[in-house]
Amino acid sequence: MTTSENDAAWPDHKPTALLVLADGTVLEGFGLGAEGHAVGEVCFNTAMTGYQEILTDPSYAGQIITFTFPHIGNVGTNEDDIETVNMAATPGARGVILRTAISDPSNYRATRHLDAWLKARGIIGLSGIDTRALTALIRSKGMPNAVIAHAKSGEFDLHGLKEEAREWPGLEGMDLVPMVTSAQRFTWDETPWIWDKGFGRQDAPEFNVVAVDYGIKRNILRLLAGVGCKVTVVPATTSAEDILAMKPDGVFLSNGPGDPAETGKYAVPVIQKIIESGTPTFGICLGHQMLGLAVGAKTKKMHQGHHGANHPVKDETTGKVEITSMNHGFAVDQATLPKGTTQTHISLFDGSNCGIALEGKPVFSVQYHPEASPGPRDSHYLFQRFADLMRQKKSA
């Protein structure tokens, strides 16, 4: 598909897409991707690369992503950069907002134009609006609820869209994990991509790990396999008894979307039993938040969230700073961390909690995404830390 064949090229006719905010504000632009409309929470992501990984991250369920970097789509799409494990699930992101038109892809790995890929995935897109102004609005007023709509005719039921945006309850109180979790148990042995070789296979695993899928990303599974794990991925509603019956050397609590307090209604009792069993446990993102809930802390909704691949985090135990990839709109309230739980990492942007460890137990978690994809690799060591804990437990 050439640029001139899609609405994203900003044709010389009336706008074909709208972003309707809950306060009644209407932003006009040009449509791309699927036609139709979707409601969600508008956030902004500051990453300059990795748009396909971001758009396929299940943690974005219920959200409309605004990219602050203006040139999105210029390297096309491919099959290797998809992060969703459950391809049958509803796409995570409800919509995407871009500043400029999508150019023809120019990359040796590209197999498809981003516009065609969005259509195939059922994701609605909008280009041609002032994304800097929208980002400034989010920074000052918080993440708004909104409807994104695309119609090639340029005709919209504006009253109905405004009403839908206004009445949508927002992400607080929503359990979105059922939309993205795997329906059945499966095993994973694919290891990280290597230049000129592609993805590898773990054919001599040292550890048996059960990964609870709240919306897990492929690169997390690859890095687990890369440190010697045979990974069994289980649905989010799997009981502690079923997990422990698999005799895991470790349990991984994955990333995912929605309000952790709502998902925690069924997940927290499971996590508490896993902690009591003494099994080494590692959590990321939503898994981190629910681990916090499991030890008695509380979570809270953030004003604008953290979404990007350049977030500095300080390791409070070493004083070192890591540049990390983040994607979350909720956080563990550090003021509620109980005795016996150590805060290990904090954000250097706002001081919010980014990591915890349980004293005297092989249990830890981080709020950010050490697997990156996209993002820096500063935090890959955490997967090795998990492997070391399992090795120590096995040799005890």
Where are these regions (language model features)?
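Active-site-proximal beta-strand elements of phosphoester/diester hydrolases
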Residues: 208-212, 324-325, 364-368
